[in-house]
UniProtKB/Swiss-Prot annotation:
This is Ribosomal RNA small subunit methyltransferase I. Pfam families: RsmI_C, TP_methylase. GO terms for molecular function: rRNA (cytosine-2'-O-)-methyltransferase activity. InterPro entries: 4pyrrol_Mease, 4pyrrol_Methylase_sf, 4pyrrole_Mease_sub1, 4pyrrole_Mease_sub2, rRNA_ssu_MeTfrase_I, RsmI_HTH, SAM_MeTrfase_RsmI_CS. Gene3D superfamilies: Cobalt-precorrin-4 Transmethylase, Domain 1, Methyltransferase, Cobalt-precorrin-4 Transmethylase, Domain 2. It comes from Neisseria meningitidis serogroup A / serotype 4A (strain DSM 15465 / Z2491). PANTHER family: RIBOSOMAL RNA SMALL SUBUNIT METHYLTRANSFERASE I (PTHR46111:SF1).
């Protein structure tokens, strides 16, 4: 039965087509039969890092001609790939892990190939985003994927300020060397907001940490190993809060904005972000100045 389906997938591979192939995000066993069939028949395999892809191919006994297509040379390589397709070749595109063009190189190549009239076919597979969401326990069908969080604190805070009251989960990627700073910025805006940190998904040291932003900070501080490896963050939807005065998150946003903007402008922007009254926010800022 296994060979039957593999053969069927292989028979469906046709020349003059660019196959965008999803690869495992950690566990090599997560590759699909269709992905194996495409990689076996591909005349050219475009790889983000040829060394990483060579290891994947070796694990399955596949010998393919690898060419490097990275962010810095993708535009230039696109015309060469179009030439291969014009010759009737089967071309596969892979990234180091997951799906090409999603936070990885690939979009420019796919666009160019489509522009000149050749088929671009997705070969679906493992997804860190879907894996994290599937175990987060968040109800509902809506979510927002942000990709990698900005590297600079100021840019992160502006981004996080937009998520103070969102009614849907937000999924993002973060790197080990920035996770501490990112959590610190989150804690300034919503320290009690629930968060899941998924680390090393499908790998040996796969870990899922859930709790408030503050609790996740504490967990990482207690165990340095939890700050290692590839990370996916799932920020849970904001809960409706009823306070007699301004919410804590609104006050935190106003505090950040008043440090960068004139009070009136900060109050107007904070009101748009939080939905709170502009006058109440303005009066809050004045009370700080009068202390």
């Amino acid at each position: 039965m296994f060979q039957k389906h593999l053969q069927k997938a292989s028979d469906s591979v046709v020349g003059g087509t660019l196959y965008v192939v999803a690869t495992p995000i950690g566990n090599l066993a997560d590759i699909t039969l269709r992905a194996l069939a495409v990689l076996q028949k591909a005349d050219i395999i475009c790889a983000e890092d040829t060394r990483v892809t060579a290891q994947l191919l070796s694990a399955y006994g596949i010998q393919g001609k690898l060419v490097s297509v990275r962010e810095h040379n993708e535009r230039q390589m696109a015309d060469k790939i179009v030439g291969y397709l014009s010759d009737g070749m089967v071309v596969a595109q892979v990234s180091d892990a997951g799906t090409p063009a999603v936070c990885d190189p690939g979009a420019k190549l796919a666009r160019r190939v489509r522009e000149v009239g050749f088929k671009v076919v997705p070969v679906v597979g493992a997804s860190a985003v879907m894996a994290a969401l599937s175990v987060a326990g968040v109800a509902g069908s809506d979510f927002y994927f942000n990709g990698f969080v900005p590297p600079k604190s100021g840019e992160r805070r502006k981004l996080f300020a937009k998520w103070v009251r969102v009614a849907f989960p937000v999924v993002m990627f973060e790197t080990p060397h920035r996770i501490g700073a990112t959590l610190a910025d989150m804690a300034e805006l919503f320290p009690e907001r629930r968060l899941m940190l998924a680390r090393e998904i499908t790998k040996t040291f796969e870990t899922f940490l859930s709790g408030t932003v503050g609790e996740i900070q504490t967990a990482l501080a207690a165990d340095g190993n939890q700050s290692r490896g590839e990370m996916v963050l799932v920020l849970y939807p904001a809960q409706d809060e009823k306070h007699e005065g301004l919410s804590e998150s609104a006050q935190n946003i106003m505090k950040i904005l008043t440090a960068e903007l004139p009070t009136k402008q900060a109050a107007e922007l904070a009101a748009k972000i939080t939905g709170e009254g502009k006058k109440a926010l303005y009066d809050l800022a004045l009370s700080w100045k009068n202390k």
